[in-house]
């Protein structure tokens, strides 16, 4: 079965990316889904969902080695300020940290 993945973020995802100020956040495709993404070195942030008005956002923090989710925030409303606050907290805790510091 082939799934169609749009090449661009949805308008709501673009709004969030613009609110976050663009760089260091960017568009990426993870598991066939357009997501907002940020590389933190040993960790990655994936912001998925939010494609439609009724679809909530989810934030996942991934450890790259071994590949696993270490933190998740799900069912987040389209509240850009709240999402940015969560992301700022995540960045402060995970940016340029070694994997074992969060165990």
Regions found by a protein language model. Give the residues of each.
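Negatively charged, low-complexity tracts enriched in Asp/Glu with abundant Ser/Thr
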Residues: 1-42, 62-81, 85, 92-103
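Short, well-ordered strand-loop elements centered on a beta-strand within folded domains, enriched
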Residues: 53-64
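Short beta-strand micro-motifs enriched in acidic
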Residues: 48-52
């Amino acid at each position: 079965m082939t799934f169609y993945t749009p090449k661009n973020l949805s308008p709501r995802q673009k709004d969030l990316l613009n609110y976050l100020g663009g760089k260091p956040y960017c568009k990426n495709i993870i598991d066939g889904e357009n997501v907002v993404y940020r590389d933190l070195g040993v960790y990655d942030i994936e912001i998925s969902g939010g494609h439609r008005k009724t679809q909530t956002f989810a934030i996942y923090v991934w450890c790259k080695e071994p590949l696993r989710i270490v933190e998740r925030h799900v069912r987040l409303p389209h509240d850009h300020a709240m999402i940015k606050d969560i992301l700022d907290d995540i960045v402060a805790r995970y940016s340029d940290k070694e994997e074992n510091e969060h165990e």
